[in-house]
Amino acid sequence: MSSDTQRWFGVVSLFPEMFQTFTEQGVTGRAVKSGKLKVDFFNPRDFTHDKHRTVDDRPYGGGPGMLMMVQPLLDAIRAAKQAAEKKTKVIYLSPQGKTLTQRGVKQLSENESVILVAGRYEGIDERVIEAEIDEEWSVGDYILSGGELPAMILMDAVARLVPGVLGHAQSAEQDSFSDGLLDCPHYTRPENLNGQSVPSVLLSGDHQKIKQWRDKQSLGRTWQRRPELLNDLALTEEQQRLLDEYQQELLQQNGSYSGMRGYDE
């Protein structure tokens, strides 16, 4: 896919107005204004045929809550597919989906067009999922009122990977999780803040030593705060050496690993 290809999102949502600021400000706003990202909305309420524009219905079997009405939702999804003009992946933002990771974001960023279905109420009819949904994605194990916020999270993460969207070409590469690790600490002026100074290596002007320090901090921070991430990585000899150095330096400072943030959780 060409780097200058416009990415398109079709969002199926009962509350498209929630996306207004999101598509006008920040990274996604710049992407939309520059033409690198296009977002169209398909409100199931616009596909109703009764005077009340009903979009919810009772679930079979009883129980609390309502489901999104099938007919308006199906029509909205199909309208989005037609607008895409080509076979497009349809994603349902669901707590039952696979957890969104940076690896998944990279995969999604390779698609020129994606349709996002933001559920409401207690969810959507299982038959709609089976017939119209290609993948289900979750942003975490917690409860939200709808799929709009997860849809924004997914779009923001994808937009950052679209060439030319970020101000610096290396910004996305240096983000946390871009290489499977957490990001290193960052510092700006003043050089001394409440008695705490910027690490001297960052003031040295030695780019090789600065990179080495950042790599070490990234590895060490991941080991301390998200050690499970290291299980999925095959560290190079240099990375393992840097991590060993980080651990030894902490031992010398603290006398043990106990009490370090995340270590004994």
Swiss-Prot record:
Role description: Specifically methylates guanosine-37 in various tRNAs.
Binding, S-adenosyl-L-methionine: 119, 139-144
Name by which UniProt lists this protein: tRNA (guanine-N(1)-)-methyltransferase
InterPro entries attached to this UniProt entry: Alpha/beta_knot_MTases, tRNA_m1G_MeTrfase_C_sf, tRNA_m1G_MeTrfase_TrmD, tRNA_m1G_MTases_N, tRNA_MeTrfase_TRMD/TRM10
Transcription regulation among keywords: no
NCBIfam families: PRK00026.1 (NF000648), trmD (TIGR00088)
UniProt subcellular location: Cytoplasm
UniProt source species: Pseudoalteromonas atlantica (strain T6c / ATCC BAA-1087)
Membership in a protein family: Belongs to the RNA methyltransferase TrmD family.
Pfam families named in the record: tRNA_m1G_MT
Assembly with partners or alone: Homodimer.
Enzyme Commission number(s) from the entry: 2.1.1.228
Gene Ontology CC annotation, any one: cytosol
Keywords assigned by UniProt, alphabetized: Cytoplasm, Methyltransferase, S-adenosyl-L-methionine, Transferase, tRNA processing
